[in-house]
Amino acid sequence: AKRGVMLLLENHWGLTTTAANMIRIIETVNSPWLRAILDMGNFYFEEDMYAAVQTIAPYVDLAHAKTYPGGGLVYTLDLDYARIFKILLDTGFSGYVSLEMEGHEDPETAVPKSMAMLREAWQTAQE
């Protein structure tokens, strides 16, 4: 806190597999310097991943938009990015969204393709 450094907790595995666990950690620490990173592909084990996004959204300062061009390396999800972006925007999200490309396709083609798809989803979410 003295240095103005924000610590962001990512939903990944173990303790941060669920939105409820992430919120429990953030609220227990109870510091304005601890917030969340939303990895859009990592609420895979939640019963309703969009409900999980809705639950954690007020705590999110950064989001990873995970894409899977050419099929995923470990798994592939068909994510509704516009729906996720809308949830974030409706809760006042003003942070950054980064691309996390995990597909088999060559990054030379996959990254521009993913960016175009995400930009379109962002526009749709703002309508």
Predicted regions and their residues:
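Short catalytic-loop micro-motif centered on adjacent basic/acidic residues
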Residues: L7-N11, I37-D39
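An active-site-proximal structural segment forming one wall of the substrate-binding cleft
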Residues: A1-R3
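Histidine-acidic metal/acid-base catalytic patches
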Residues: T16-E127
